Amino acid sequence: MVFTKEEVDYSLYLVTDSTMLPPGTTLCSQVEAGLKNGVTLVQIREKDIETKNFVAEALEVQKICKKYNVPLIINDRIDVAMAIDADGVHVGQDDMPIPMVRKLLGPSKILGWSVGKPSEVETLAKWGPDMVDYIGVGTLFPTSTKKNPKKSPMGPQGAIAILDALEEFKATWCRTVGIGGLHPDNIQRVLCQCVASNGKRSLDGISLVSDIMAAPDACAATKRLRGLLDATRYQFVECELNNTFPTTTSIQNVISQVSNNRPLVQHITNKVHQNFGANVTLALGSSPIMSEIESEVSELARIPNASLLLNTGSVAPIEMLKAAINAYNEVNRPITFDPVGYSATETRLCLNNTLLTYGQFACIKGNCSEILSLAKLNNHKMKGVDSSSGKTNIDTLVRATQIVAFQYRTVAVCTGEFDCVADGTFGGEYKLSSGTEGITAEDLPCVIIEDGPIPIMGDITASGCSLGSTIASFIGGLDSTGKLFDAVVGAVLLYKSAGKLASTRCQGSGSFHVELIDALYQLFHENKPEKWSASLKKFK
């Protein structure tokens, strides 16, 4: 059967591996189970097999693919593909050059190419639409199916760079499939986050091996994968993701929910912050726990209204941090991420980027320098972990906040004299191929919170970190009717107002510590946002 390029469905792309078959199954039985339940494209990948056996295997799989009207792709072996008249070939960067492959295959066959750099996209764009039909974008995450991986995992941000390059070089014809380390626990996050910066394209599909080939019940495994692709919504927290402009009434409702639910806030944070953060959390009607014990994170995450504040001011063991992120993501409990000193040192940059790649965060909160660096709008490396926005204007800070919110599908907070809060969750919605249909970072809803200068805030330790405690308390206390954006905005508004109130009462930096906790307690328990001193307005 001949498939036209336009009608190929890349959404669920199965790559075979005969070395991981469960007992009682065959390669053909696993492939057919996948095809029965939603696989849309099959690639035979065999690295250690005699040509005669490869051809025989390919012919058997081809019969099954024809039965389900699904294209068959051969990995690397152009001779095998031509011998059985397969529907196409997939090659890597070190395989036969693309122009030569196309010359051998002819114009009608599907030709795929593994791509991991924007420069490779530039090359395929120069070749034009007659060469590469689709690219495998990756490797996204670590994977055991590559015995000697030559590329480091790129994560969703690397995939975004590839999608941006396709748009920049106008390779509109080229389809994309995410490859490498994709499993049910990260597929929806990848589909949600991997959107070009101009909002005009997203991944066309995902490629998997072990989740079908190694599954004892490949039918059920494929149904689950198909369901994730078709869901079009990633509900990564148990509250509402739809945003409207916060009002005093909606913020009152948030505080009432926090007060009623008394969330448990697990702090993984720096030692300087721990005591002050615990007292701030208590002042907000919440229960703090300072725990960096890997073996208990799953239990803590499952406590009703649990919330995690992950602050990288002190570098905890990376495996413990990953375990915590995974535990909270697994049960859809919110994580507030504070990438302290994001790019201050290579160690911090590597740690923060690793964690950003590993999980989904309900809120990413940082000072001006951190958010500018995250958005790649900072021209210099941070000096230490303190904020140093200098003369950066409010338009640039808003833009940076919106970029972070857009790229990480989160509510982003940029702190300073003016606090910016942007919602990039898109209600958790995602679409294959079409991205956000042209909606970009600068289109995201963003609010500005200000209360004049409060210089004494910078004269105490952990004032910025404790805003993280406040946000984590508010979003952890939401029930299913609460709105994430309202909670984050309400937390920032309360904290700013409490800071101003405390600054009028204190005698110096020592008493400011105490007055800030008292002010937070007072404003939270009074629950009268209409009387708070900080102002809230939409940006433009």
UniProtKB/Swiss-Prot annotation:
Residues that bind 2-[(2R,5Z)-2-carboxy-4-methylthiazol-5(2H)-ylidene]ethyl phosphate: 143-145, 181, 209-210
Enzyme Commission number(s) from the entry: 2.5.1.3, 2.7.1.50
Active site positions: 465 (proton acceptor)
Region feature (Hydroxyethylthiazole kinase): 239-540
Cofactor binding, note field: Binds 1 Mg(2+) ion per subunit.
Catalytic activity, reaction form: 2-[(2R,5Z)-2-carboxy-4-methylthiazol-5(2H)-ylidene]ethyl phosphate + 4-amino-2-methyl-5-(diphosphooxymethyl)pyrimidine + 2 H(+) = thiamine phosphate + CO2 + diphosphate; 2-(2-carboxy-4-methylthiazol-5-yl)ethyl phosphate + 4-amino-2-methyl-5-(diphosphooxymethyl)pyrimidine + 2 H(+) = thiamine phosphate + CO2 + diphosphate; 4-methyl-5-(2-phosphooxyethyl)-thiazole + 4-amino-2-methyl-5-(diphosphooxymethyl)pyrimidine + H(+) = thiamine phosphate + diphosphate; 5-(2-hydroxyethyl)-4-methylthiazole + ATP = 4-methyl-5-(2-phosphooxyethyl)-thiazole + ADP + H(+)
Example GO BP: thiamine biosynthetic process
Gene3D superfamilies: 3.40.1190.20, Aldolase class I
Superkingdom of the source species: Eukaryota
Cofactor(s) needed for function: Mg(2+)
Pathway(s) annotated for this protein in UniProt: Cofactor biosynthesis; thiamine diphosphate biosynthesis; 4-methyl-5-(2-phosphoethyl)-thiazole from 5-(2-hydroxyethyl)-4-methylthiazole: step 1/1; Cofactor biosynthesis; thiamine diphosphate biosynthesis; thiamine phosphate from 4-amino-2-methyl-5-diphosphomethylpyrimidine and 4-methyl-5-(2-phosphoethyl)-thiazole: step 1/1
UniProt keyword terms in alphabetical order: ATP-binding, Kinase, Magnesium, Metal-binding, Multifunctional enzyme, Nucleotide-binding, Thiamine biosynthesis, Transferase
Amino-acid positions noted as binding Mg(2+) in the UniProt annotation, renumbered to this chain: 76, 95
Enzymatic class: transferase
Keyword Cell inner membrane (UniProt): no
Substitution effect: residue 370 to K: In THI6-3; possesses TMP-PPASE activity only
HAMAP family (alphabetical): TMP_synthase
Protein name: Thiamine biosynthetic bifunctional enzyme
Native organism: Saccharomyces cerevisiae (strain ATCC 204508 / S288c)
